């Protein structure tokens, strides 16, 4: 074969509309906005090329390998309804392009380079189909939903959490005191804020000690198992593991990590440590909106959520639908199912582009957190169901009577909603009535209801489904 130098159009090699995808391929759905004058086939093929074997010109060394075996292929393109110049381009990647058990390598390949590509005005990775053959190379969540329930001995209801506020500035002793009050009042978990690591006003070791003391005291008083998400996120992997080891030595049930700022390599290491040592792992998604909030550019959160399930985590923040942070209901429920269920059918009405089979990888519990309070409890119980953690930071610590009564109010509201649901009542229609009835016999709940009766965060979601 004679080598022919020069710049060839990408679509000649990488746009193959008739190609059949393999069961072992990783499939990607990209939302592509080409520059004016660039046809969608060329743009789609360019994405496939630049995220797999291609480069800008033909190279001599192409002859030393089998491009047909290794190249990504753009196998289908569809216009986005309601958008003049946007297309969904589907790309299939051969499995051999990826290192086993490495989310880091998967992302470096698929989204590493191509997003700066000049022929594209914008590019967003909307969804990935991870084949069972690749999933089986990952450990996944350290324990998963069922094992967590068994460890905590809590069934048949969502779990309750609270982020300790003010997030920065408390001393370790006062921080521990707030933890104790919330847990004693009836919460299951309290949480380090994502930016609490080890700062001058509160070093990590002191915080770990006082929080452990708080949760043992609360356990003894309530007869329930309690947890505090001790944030092990640190500047180096070694320091992170050191903190996790200390948490294990204290005998606490759960640690926490910021998986996007900490990075997938660190996160996967921590997840392996947690499984080997019986620690649950709570994952915070700090920095996600930088990546996922723009509708036409970046990576959709459902992809970051899938990646986390592969890398490993037992809880992950997944939006509230009703609070202060972004999240359209159908889209949120789509990736909540991707986190929890074993098999998820393709469903474009919920933003799910591919059928995903997790082949028994443990599930992740979605965490609803951010601007929620007792009046939201019926909606949250209905939307998220039992396998979830509902986190009320300000909604606990902002109760007028203090932290413990704030916790009592949340627990009473939750138990009332679960009871009503189990009796067959419609939480969506009767939610306010259910909360009002419960507040008649719980003065703590009545006080909380009074404070937050008018609070709403009324903004339209930025990231919406495409509709005709």
Swiss-Prot record:
GO MF term list: magnesium ion binding; monooxygenase activity; ribulose-bisphosphate carboxylase activity
Keywords associated with the record? Calvin cycle, Carbon dioxide fixation, Chloroplast, Disulfide bond, Lyase, Magnesium, Metal-binding, Methylation, Monooxygenase, Oxidoreductase, Photorespiration, Photosynthesis, Plastid
One Gene Ontology biological process: photorespiration
Report the PROSITE patterns cross-referenced here.
RUBISCO_LARGE
Q: Which SUPFAM superfamilies does this one have? A: RuBisCo, C-terminal domain, RuBisCO, large subunit, small (N-terminal) domain
Q: Which cofactor does it need?
A: Mg(2+)
PTM N6,N6,N6-trimethyllysine: list the residues.
4
One GO location term (cellular component):
chloroplast
The catalysed reaction is: 2 (2R)-3-phosphoglycerate + 2 H(+) = D-ribulose 1,5-bisphosphate + CO2 + H2O; D-ribulose 1,5-bisphosphate + O2 = 2-phosphoglycolate + (2R)-3-phosphoglycerate + 2 H(+)
Positions of post-translational N6-carboxylysine modification: 191
Its domain of life? Eukaryota
| Binding-site residues for substrate, renumbered to this chain | 113, 163, 167, 285, 317, 369
The record's listing under Pfam families reads: RuBisCO_large, RuBisCO_large_N
What's the stated role of this polypeptide? RuBisCO catalyzes two reactions: the carboxylation of D-ribulose 1,5-bisphosphate, the primary event in carbon dioxide fixation, as well as the oxidative fragmentation of the pentose substrate in the photorespiration process. Both reactions occur simultaneously and in competition at the same active site.
Q: Which family does it belong to?
A: Belongs to the RuBisCO large chain family. Type I subfamily.
Something else the entry says is:
The basic functional RuBisCO is composed of a large chain homodimer in a 'head-to-tail' conformation. In form I RuBisCO this homodimer is arranged in a barrel-like tetramer with the small subunits forming a tetrameric 'cap' on each end of the 'barrel'.
Q: What is this protein called?
A: Ribulose bisphosphate carboxylase large chain
Q: What is the lineage of its organism?
A: Eukaryota, Viridiplantae, Streptophyta, Embryophyta, Tracheophyta
Q: Which gene encodes it?
A: rbcL
């Amino acid at each position: 074969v004679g080598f022919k130098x020069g710049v060839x159009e990408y679509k000649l090699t990488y746009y193959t509309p008739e190609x059949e995808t393999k069961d072992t391929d990783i499939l990607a759905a990209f939302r592509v906005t080409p520059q004016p004058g660039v046809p969608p086939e060329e743009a789609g093929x360019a994405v496939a090329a630049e995220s797999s074997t291609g480069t800008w010109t033909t190279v001599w060394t192409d002859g030393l390998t089998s491009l047909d075996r290794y190249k990504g292929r753009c196998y289908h393109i569809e216009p986005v309804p309601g958008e003049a110049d946007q297309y969904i381009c589907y790309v299939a990647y051969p499995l051999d392009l990826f290192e086993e058990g490495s989310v880091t390598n998967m992302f470096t390949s698929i989204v590493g380079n191509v997003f700066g590509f000049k022929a594209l005005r914008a590019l967003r990775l909307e969804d990935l189909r991870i084949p069972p053959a690749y999933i089986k190379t990952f450990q996944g969540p350290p324990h998963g939903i069922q094992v967590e329930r068994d460890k905590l001995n809590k069934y048949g209801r969502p779990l309750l959490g609270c982020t300790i506020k003010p997030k920065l500035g408390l001393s370790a002793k006062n921080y521990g005191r707030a933890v104790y009050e919330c847990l004693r009042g009836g919460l299951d978990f309290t949480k380090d804020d994502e930016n609490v690591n080890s700062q001058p006003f509160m070093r990590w070791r002191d915080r770990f000690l006082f929080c452990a003391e708080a949760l043992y005291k609360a356990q003894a008083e309530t007869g329930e198992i309690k947890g505090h998400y001790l944030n092990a996120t640190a500047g180096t992997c070694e320091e992170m593991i050191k903190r996790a080891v200390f948490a294990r030595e204290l005998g606490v049930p759960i640690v926490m990590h910021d998986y996007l700022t900490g990075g997938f390599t660190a996160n996967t290491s921590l997840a392996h440590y947690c499984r080997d040592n019986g620690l649950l792992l709570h994952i915070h998604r700090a920095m996600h909106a930088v990546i996922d909030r723009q509708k036409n550019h970046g990576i959709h959160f459902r992809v970051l959520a899938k990646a986390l399930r592969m890398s490993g985590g037992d809880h992950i923040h997944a939006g509230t639908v009703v609070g202060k942070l972004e999240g359209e209901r159908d889209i949120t429920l789509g990736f909540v199912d991707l986190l929890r269920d074993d098999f998820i059918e393709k469903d474009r009405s919920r933003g799910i582009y591919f059928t995903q089979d997790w082949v028994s990888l443990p599930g992740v519990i979605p965490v609803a957190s951010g601007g929620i309070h007792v009046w939201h409890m019926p909606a949250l119980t209905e939307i998220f169901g039992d396998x979830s953690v509902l986190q009320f930071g300000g909604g606990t610590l902002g109760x007028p009577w203090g932290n413990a009564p704030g916790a009592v109010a949340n627990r009473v509201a939750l138990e009332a909603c679960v009871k009503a649901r189990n009796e067959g009542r419609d939480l969506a229609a009767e939610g306010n009535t259910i909360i009002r009835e419960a507040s008649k016999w719980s003065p703590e709940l009545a006080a909380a209801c009074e404070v937050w009766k008018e609070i709403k965060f009324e903004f339209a979601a930025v990231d919406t489904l495409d509709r005709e």
